[in-house]
A protein has these predicted regions:
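Histidine-dependent nucleotide/RNA phosphoesterase domain, centered on the 2H-phosphoesterase fold
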Residues: 1-190
Length: 190
């Protein structure tokens, strides 16, 4: 049986503020060779990572997502704060999130997880933390300097997104980083 590595997300268009912030990080942390930055043209907020998905299940997943999307209206997201996954001792991911994510996002995510559960793609045990990955950290040469740079990031709105659709992606892992192919765009409220 053939599979595809898939996930459902909200694709986030880049403003000028976000790439500028990433470039400042790269410049300030240029001596850190084990940090992989997400390409700014691939920024997305993952709602459900399905992982290895049977090709024969893809049409049913798309149909289920379309049914859910019809019940939800477009909404707005403002990404205005940064955070770390891992810990200050061992940071693993630097992310951009929201101080006050809208309830509409959580309602949509919950309905989508229910739909995926019904198809046998069960939810993760982790709580949903809506975020955009800025970079993944394999190892730090100078952890204190990294934390100093991280703590100096201005907390302001870096991205504003009018969410009008979901995107079902296929992910290809490559040595240079992941590549995403759009399988289906699914409008909200239609």
């Amino acid at each position: 049986m053939k599979t595809k590595r898939t996930f459902l997300a909200i694709s986030i268009p880049c403003s000028t503020e976000f790439p500028a912030m990433v470039e400042r990080l790269k410049k300030n942390l240029q001596h850190e060779h084990y940090i992989n930055y997400v390409k700014t043209n691939q920024i997305h907020l993952t709602l459900k990572f399905a992982g290895e998905t049977l090709e024969e299940d893809v049409p049913a997943i798309i149909e289920a997502c379309q049914k859910v999307a019809k019940r939800h209206q477009p909404f707005v997201l403002d990404f205005d704060r940064t955070g770390l996954f891992g810990s200050n001792r061992v940071p693993r991911v630097l992310w951009l999130g929201m101080a006050n994510p809208p309830q509409a996002l959580f309602d949509l995510e919950e309905d989508l997880l229910d739909a995926f559960d019904e198809l046998g793609y069960l939810r993760d045990r982790q709580n949903f933390v809506p975020h955009l990955t800025v970079c993944r950290i394999k190892q730090l040469v100078d952890k204190q300097f990294f934390l100093q740079i991280y703590n100096s990031i201005e907390q302001k709105t870096y991205l504003h997104a009018d969410v009008k659709e979901l995107v079902y992606f296929q992910s290809f892992l490559q040595p240079t980083g992941p590549f995403y192919k759009v399988l289906k765009k699914i409008p909200l409220g239609q």
